[in-house]
């Protein structure tokens, strides 16, 4: 693999050349040219990617690292799992060659096959220690396997061909690895929002895909969010923006970047030509688009002070993910409502789902949302059978904290959460912030009492005053009948049998001795034994029984467990929720349309 200098004949100080030639082996070939290496040049590959808080050990996919100077081999010493030292002549260019296996379809790493290639710089581009702030370049080289492919990336093009292969530049290493690259045969569309050119590429869509609808709806989201952050007429922080969507049979997720986002969704989630009304999957996709785009401001510019400068070698801890992910989660669906893509009923259904997810998580009473933020590295991204019992999602509970703060500020009559977000943007000049900064702006926008409430919501495990605050803004709460799994304290998977995935703390299933991994085979009630294949069968065969026997399979043994549902199998009716009684399943409806409209449409308090 040989790369060429740019048109000026001058190669940037740090130059990467990437080629997708061995597509059937899923291998990217990479060459790193260092114009002025140190005598003992250190190199490392990040262990994590910003925005996804888990040590992922990207170096496990790197192989065959070699170094040369003037065509001659140079000694390479591996110092750790992700670090190498090159014994260089500091007066000559150093060329490092290696391959990276790309076999992860997620948005976090890299993928390569005959159809498409994708990578984040954190998976392919070594960090040249001591030279991170120097200009970097990425050259994408074509190959016989990629001759009809196109390229999409947020990197600045310097010298590229019609398909996008060629030379791109970045001001420094952080910028280089914050601009993922999509390659392949894909659908491409564009629009302008807030004066900023936007591009949308979609790989893997079915022929029925309605690209024009996706573009039109995405444009509405972008225009609404730009208007939100730049109500004062200031310019957005990016010159252009790229959406990269990988469409597969069944997956979902996204990762934010400074002027782009990588997304993944299921084919059935896309809008279809001739379809008058898209399904819930499409609304979920629009929520994802809204979420990642909002991160352009809230995470990529506004960010935790602890992450002002990334340490790519280890975990970067912060207690503020409730703000950066949770508040973004509050606004993602809210902007679908403000942009006219959801009606009030659809939006409240999404809010209801979030509330119930939190209320049905025993871990909310064990760990605060600030603690959950700090523990993201070992808990949120490493979920297991006990996760629901000992932690809470900083996405979902964080979004409810944002909801409560917005409603509390509006009830106070002076401001709202929109003012807080824009105030933080102004006072930080779109840079790092601390919790103290958030509290100070809340105090200024509302009063110190509301700031104190926010601090308590974030650092305690008390339930949030959701019903009281919603009621003050025209939203009535009602207690909804719980599903059987919720009544029993179970989370299950049904596939011709009942597989127990989680046993929730304090529930009837835990008291009976059930555990994650059990297969629930049968129930015995009133002297009759019944085989079950789905959880509803329990209610079918044992309704009205105050005690029943559950037969479960565990480690090839059949166990007999006594379950005391205590009338939980009986059907229940909905009832109004008063603010004093604990509720684990909530429904919402509008009781005062004018008050609700002021909140849902973003009218100032």
Language model regions located:
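Early extracytoplasmic/domain-onset interaction patches
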Residues: 2-48
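Non-catalytic architectural context of zinc metalloproteases
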Residues: 4, 56-64, 68, 72-220, ...
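Intrinsic-disorder/low-complexity, polar/charged segments enriched in Ser/Thr/Lys/Arg/Asp/Glu/Gln
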Residues: 13-15, 27-31, 40-42, 93-95, ...
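N-terminal, post-signal-peptide region of Sec/Tat-exported proteins
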Residues: 37-67
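Soluble non-cytosolic domains of exported or imported proteins
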Residues: 132, 208-220, 279-280, 284, ...
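Juxtacatalytic substrate-recognition/specificity segment
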Residues: 190-321
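Post-HExxH zinc-binding segment in Zn-dependent metallohydrolases
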Residues: 261-268, 301-302, 313-364, 551
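C-terminal recognition in membrane/secretory proteostasis and scaffolding
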Residues: 332, 342-605
């Amino acid at each position: 693999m040989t790369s060429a200098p740019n048109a000026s004949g001058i190669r940037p100080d740090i130059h990467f050349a990437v080629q997708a030639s061995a597509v059937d082996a899923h291998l990217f070939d990479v060459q790193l040219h260092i114009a002025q290496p140190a005598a003992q040049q250190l190199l490392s590959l990040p262990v994590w990617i910003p925005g996804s808080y888990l040590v992922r050990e990207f170096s496990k996919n790197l192989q065959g690292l070699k170094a040369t100077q003037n065509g001659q081999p140079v000694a390479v010493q591996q110092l750790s799992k992700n670090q190498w030292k090159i014994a260089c002549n500091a007066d000559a260019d150093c060329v490092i060659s290696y391959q990276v296996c790309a076999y992860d379809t997620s948005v976090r790493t890299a993928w390569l096959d005959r159809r498409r290639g994708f990578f984040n710089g954190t998976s392919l581009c070594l960090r040249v220690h001591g030279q991170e702030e120097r200009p970097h370049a990425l050259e994408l080289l074509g190959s016989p396997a990629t001759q009809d492919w196109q390229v999409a990336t947020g990197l600045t093009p310097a010298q590229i061909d019609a398909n996008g292969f060629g030379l791109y530049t970045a001001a420094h290493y952080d910028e280089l690895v914050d601009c993922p690259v999509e390659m392949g045969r894909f659908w491409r569309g564009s629009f302008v929002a807030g004066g900023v050119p936007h591009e949308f590429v979609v790989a893997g869509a079915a022929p029925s895909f309605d690209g024009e609808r996706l573009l039109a709806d995405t444009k509405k989201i972008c225009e609404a969010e730009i208007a939100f952050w730049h109500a004062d007429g200031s310019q957005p922080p990016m010159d252009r923006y790229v959406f990269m969507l990988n469409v597969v049979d069944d997956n979902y997720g996204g990762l934010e970047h400074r002027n782009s986002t990588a997304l993944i969704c299921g084919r059935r989630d896309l809008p279809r030509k001739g379809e008058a009304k898209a399904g819930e999957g499409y609304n979920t996709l629009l929520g994802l688009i809204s979420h990642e785009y909002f991160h352009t401001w809230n995470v990529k510019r506004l960010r935790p002070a602890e992450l002002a400068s990334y340490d790519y070698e280890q975990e970067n801890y912060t207690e503020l993910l409730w703000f950066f992910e949770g508040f973004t989660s509050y606004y993602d669906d809210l902007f679908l409502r403000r942009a006219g893509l959801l009606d009030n009923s659809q939006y409240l259904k999404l809010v209801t789902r979030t509330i119930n997810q939190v209320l049905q998580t025993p871990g909310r009473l064990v760990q605060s949302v600030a603690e959950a933020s700090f523990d993201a590295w070992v808990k949120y991204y490493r979920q297991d059978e006990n996760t629901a019992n000992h932690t809470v999602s900083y996405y979902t509970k964080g979004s409810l904290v944002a909801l409560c703060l917005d409603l509390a500020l509006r009830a106070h009559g002076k401001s709202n959460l929109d003012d807080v977000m824009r105030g933080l943007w102004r006072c930080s000049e779109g840079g790092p912030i601390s919790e103290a900064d958030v509290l100070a702006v809340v105090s200024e926008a509302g009063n110190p009492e509301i700031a104190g409430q926010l601090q308590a919501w974030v650092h305690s495990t008390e339930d949030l005053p959701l019903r009281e605050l919603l009621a003050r803004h025209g939203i009535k709460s009602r207690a909804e009948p719980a599903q059987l799994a919720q009544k029993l304290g179970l989370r299950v998977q049904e596939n011709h049998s009942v597989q127990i995935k989680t046993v929730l703390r304090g529930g009837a299933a835990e008291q009976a001795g059930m555990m994650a991994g059990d297969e629930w085979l049968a129930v015995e009630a009133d002297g009759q034994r019944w085989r079950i294949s789905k959880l509803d069968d329990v209610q079918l065969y044992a309704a009205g029984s105050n005690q029943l026997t559950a037969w479960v399979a565990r480690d090839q043994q059949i166990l007999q467990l006594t379950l005391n549902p205590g009338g939980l199998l009986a059907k229940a009716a909905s009832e109004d929720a008063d603010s004093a009684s604990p509720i684990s399943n909530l429904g919402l409806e509008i009781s005062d349309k004018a008050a609700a409209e002021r909140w849902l449409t973003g009218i100032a308090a």
